[in-house]
Design a protein with these regions (language model features):
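Internal maturation/activation junctions in enzymes
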Residues: 1-40, 132-145, 149, 153, ...
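Conserved mixed alpha/beta core segments that line enzyme active sites in large multi-domain catalysts
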Residues: 39, 46-50, 55-56, 62, ...
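Function-dense linear segments that define catalytic or interfacial modules
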Residues: 55-168
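Exposed alpha-helical structural elements
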Residues: 45, 49, 102, 116-119, ...
Length: 204
């Protein structure tokens, strides 16, 4: 999948997935389309965008706020927020232009305890940290190498959440588990980055 971030004023992108687009333009199914906001729009423009999204029946064009992205990037204190960030197609990873994320997946089983998940997250984080050292890309511009060396983004994803008694609920216990798991990933990454002689991931 790809993501397309367009200007708010781009009417062609606004309606790219309206009507029966899949009959005449089936390749559009491969991209998620969003408007990239660089400032707060006035209410009339904002409502027009929402109305267009509703009428498209496709859930697009979505909304991506670059100002909010900069604030989020600055939260950890490890990441330089002075970029016009984009995002991956699912919208959970902030990316520089020519940026990438080293993804690993944790499979959650229904009976997993917090300790079980900590161990799985640890292994996934170690794998992602090692993967981030593979930064000498051939056949692409050097900026890809530079960004990977500087940021070493990790994505420790979890699948099977809805099968789990604790994590499938919107509860304070689930929130606490997720906070602990993320903190553990950050700690493990810092330890292994030091062992490998590389910088810590700026975001996990």
């Amino acid at each position: 999948a790809l993501i397309s971030l367009s200007n708010l004023s781009d009417d062609r992108m606004r309606v790219a997935k309206s009507g029966k687009w899949w009959e005449s333009e089936p390749q559009r199914a491969l991209a998620n389309n969003s408007a990239a906001y660089t400032e707060r729009p006035d209410m009339e423009i904002f409502l027009k965008e929402w109305q267009s999204l509703i009428e498209s029946k496709s859930g697009e064009r979505g909304i991506f706020n670059r100002v909010a992205a900069k604030k989020k990037a600055a939260e950890s204190g490890r990441r330089n927020p002075d970029f016009d960030f984009g995002t991956n197609p699912c919208g959970e990873i902030l990316l520089r232009s020519a940026g990438l994320c080293n993804l690993t997946e944790v499979v959650i089983r229904a009976g997993d305890t917090l300790k079980d998940l900590m161990e799985k997250v640890e292994v996934a984080t170690i794998m992602g940290t090692f993967q981030s050292t593979l930064s000498k890309f051939r056949y692409v511009r050097s900026i890809w190498h530079k960004n990977q060396e500087e940021e070493r983004l990790l994505g420790v994803s979890m699948t099977g959440i809805m099968d789990h008694e604790v994590l499938s609920k919107a509860s304070s216990e689930a929130a606490n588990w997720l906070t602990e798991l993320r903190a553990h990933a950050v700690k493990v990454n810092a330890e292994w980055a030091a062992k490998l002689g590389i910088n810590q991931s700026v975001a996990i």
